[in-house]
Amino acid sequence: MLAVVCPIEGAVPERYGQLIDTVLQNAKKVSGDKKDTEAAVILRDEKDFLYWCETQKKPGSCIVFAVHLDRSGINLRLYAILKEMDYHTDCLLGCTGAILVDGENELYTKNMAKKIAFSLNRAGCMLPGHTFAEATGSLKNQTKNAMHRNLSSKEAFF
């Protein structure tokens, strides 16, 4: 089973909406579970997160944090989820995770990705390989990746 944590309030910025759509479209590939009939469950806040951890999480579940940061680099719903992970230190034991962080400006995305990675790790979640992908407002940090893959910066991130 794949859980996608996408904490956001209010209107969804277009690029973030595209990010979530891309994650959901590829949910079966990410989860690797061909028998899984439900491709993904969306977790929007700490209540959804705790409910999933307590009732729906199975050994080997995958969890993807797809996070949008505003200009200030703050996402209050995300902080509430991180707080719950700190209180329930084994809530993600046996899970595998990935992190995608999208931001409105050039700051905060890498710092937030590291905070999420730390909390996931403390909660027992395994983060293999390249743990996170982050996109700054201009997508300048995707230039090298795009050049290597012969894509636009936007295509490289998605």
Predicted regions and their residues:
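FMN-binding flavodoxin-like domain, especially the glycine-rich phosphate-binding loop
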Residues: 1-158
